């Protein structure tokens, strides 16, 4: 048993290393975001900076992948545009000159139709998420985000999308999840300050965190098909019957290939989507930034009525660090999505939330209470049971005859 465990760890060592790096960088990024918004509480400006900085880093990464095949082959298919005819078994890569001669796929109407909703979700979600982070502890924001399964189920029921069957286990998991989040939020917001203004700000921060979580739930439902990449090679293998199945269990259905091809949305590589989504998000939030926060920045830099400004400092290094962490998180996410199953990624993503909560408690420096630990345990149990329900539902769907 121990030999099998050690062999499994050695085989998946790079995945374990990626997950640990993901948790570490995500936790640091959350703390850096909190520090930035504490001294410079401008959520729109931070979002604008993240959008443009992410687009620049993504373009630069595409340039490296375009110029160096070895770097291109490190990442799973669908991370970059198809620069090369990639044969991973023989370690040979040839430039696809006739297919794509530019760094990213040129803008077109289908691309804009795809990224416009995602850019809008990013803009609104970032604004409320950053606002919440500036008002309440990071652990509060992270714990509220773990409520997303409940809202996903609710939206799927409202939109009449195929969803999980309501069972006692599912109900118990959601109740446990809500109770755990409630305990964490209550404990986090026990502030020594007693002013009504701070309490109102705390309540507003919780509301903003809820809105941000709801927006990103909508984004995940919409983006599920957009970020599912299939290259032409994969499609031809699938049509010829040689594609690798997710499960050894047979699928008892036969679909009209022409109908499937007609209904299936066009898929783009993840870096192209990242660049266009960032640019669209930047453009959508630019007007709001100019109206609401640019006057504040203008007064701060030109020392106009500086005594009343909300900006305590302008930490350029923290802005750059925050944007870099934000981009690295996205690249690790893309790599994991191409290396592990959807269920494994979901569990890893949930574990990331717990890491962010735990690290935020350490950074705050306050004594961790037993109620906080109990709330985190309830949160973990609820999410674990929810994932079990999800995986069992998928297995039953695969073996059910049509």
Curated annotation (Swiss-Prot):
This is Uncharacterized transporter YJL193W. It comes from Saccharomyces cerevisiae (strain ATCC 204508 / S288c). GO terms for cellular component: endoplasmic reticulum; Golgi apparatus; membrane. The chain crosses the membrane at residues 13-33, 51-71, 104-124, 135-155, 166-186, 207-227, 272-292, 354-374. It comes from the Eukaryota. Residues 1-12, 72-103, 156-165, 228-271, 375-402 are cytoplasmic. InterPro entries: Sugar_P_trans_dom (IPR004853), TPT_transporter (IPR050186). It holds the Pfam family TPT.
């Amino acid at each position: 048993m121990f030999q099998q465990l050690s062999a499994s760890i050695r085989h998946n060592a790079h995945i374990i290393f990626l997950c640990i790096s993901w948790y570490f960088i995500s936790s640091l990024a959350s703390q850096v975001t909190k520090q930035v918004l504490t001294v410079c509480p401008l959520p729109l400006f931070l979002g604008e900076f993240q959008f443009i900085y992410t687009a620049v880093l993504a373009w630069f990464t595409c340039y490296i992948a375009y110029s160096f095949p070895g770097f291109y082959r490190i990442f799973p298919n669908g991370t970059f545009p198809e620069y090369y005819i990639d044969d991973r078994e023989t370690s040979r890569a040839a430039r696809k000159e006739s297919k794509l001669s530019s760094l990213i796929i040129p803008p077109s109407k289908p691309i804009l139709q795809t990224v416009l909703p995602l850019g809008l979700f990013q803009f609104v979600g970032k604004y409320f998420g950053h606002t919440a982070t500036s008002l309440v502890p990071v652990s509060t924001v992270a714990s509220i985000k773990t409520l997303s399964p409940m809202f996903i189920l609710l939206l799927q029921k409202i939109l009449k999308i195929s969803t999980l069957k309501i069972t006692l286990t599912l109900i118990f998991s959601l109740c446990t999840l809500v109770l755990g989040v409630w305990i964490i939020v209550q404990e986090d917001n026990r502030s020594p300050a007693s002013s009504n203004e701070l309490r109102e700000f705390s309540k507003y921060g919780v509301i903003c965190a809820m809105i941000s979580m709801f927006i990103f739930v909508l984004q995940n439902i919409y983006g599920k098909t957009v970020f599912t990449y299939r290259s032409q090679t994969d499609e031809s293998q699938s049509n010829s019957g040689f594609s690798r199945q997710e499960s050894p269990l047979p699928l008892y259905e036969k679909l009209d290939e022409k109908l499937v091809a007609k209904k299936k949305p066009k898929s783009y590589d993840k870096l192209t989507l990242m660049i266009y989504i960032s640019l669209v998000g930047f453009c959508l939030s630019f007007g709001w930034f100019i109206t609401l926060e640019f006057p504040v920045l203008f007064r701060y830099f030109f020392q106009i009525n500086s005594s009343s400004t909300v900006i305590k400092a302008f930490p350029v290094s923290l802005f750059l660090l925050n944007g870099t962490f934000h981009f690295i998180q996205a690249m690790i996410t893309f790599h994991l999505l191409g290396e592990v199953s959807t269920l494994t990624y979901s569990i890893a993503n949930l574990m990331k939330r717990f890491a962010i909560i735990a690290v935020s408690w350490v950074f705050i420096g306050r004594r961790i209470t037993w109620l906080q630990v109990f709330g985190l345990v309830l949160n973990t149990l609820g999410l674990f049971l929810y994932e079990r329900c999800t995986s069992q539902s998928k297995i039953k769907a695969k073996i059910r005859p049509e």
